[in-house]
């Protein structure tokens, strides 16, 4: 049983819905328990695209499907279960904000867990638009953002999807005016990101041989927010990104995005970070981990 404690994102962190953004008593966290560090994407087709005719594993043989049944619950439902636990006191940094004494167990509480899962296969729908390049058509620049969401998706993914659609609209206007790109540009809206990077991984696996030779760069967005420029990626793109950031004006301060980010680092960073921000001519790009649709391109196929 997984629950989000109010200490993390409930009433202890601020006003709860509908009076604020924090999780209410009956709110349940949504997320994936697929073992994505092992491999993301369709659990039944590791390493190959999940096309109609792809050979599939049996569910029992899929290594990324958890063998322990998992059910997320609200902290309202978790409270009586935790309150009934006995045993020694939990360490202080393990304790949450519920009005109970947090203990490690065991105790008299017994829980009967009944999980009903549907194992039917369902199609996912990636939306792909391609603008052929004129000079280097076999060099692909791919721009992606997922379109699926756990609920309504105002922040995740729509905050990233709307800018991507606006970019595509702008390029469409340029095409009508006679502009053509040097390299092939592929715009992608991925399905199934939330359950396990499904749409992007399966598309990348289907086109793996082409991407290894033609993939120049993959540009990903997901949950864009108001504020400062924040970038992570391959350091080979650091010089390019700094040039772009110098060309973009921040609408609030009318500084360049580069200058505003530098000032934020100087104002908010540690002593070492402030010195680094003053001394460096370029802003640093953070290293990528995983967790969004860039994963199959960077970690699996080596596309920056």
Regions found by a protein language model. Give the residues of each.
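Extended, hydrophobic alpha-helical segments in both membrane/secreted and soluble proteins
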Residues: 125-127, 139-175, 181-205, 217-221, ...
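Short helix-terminating capping/connector loops at secondary-structure junctions
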Residues: 106, 177-183, 210-214, 259
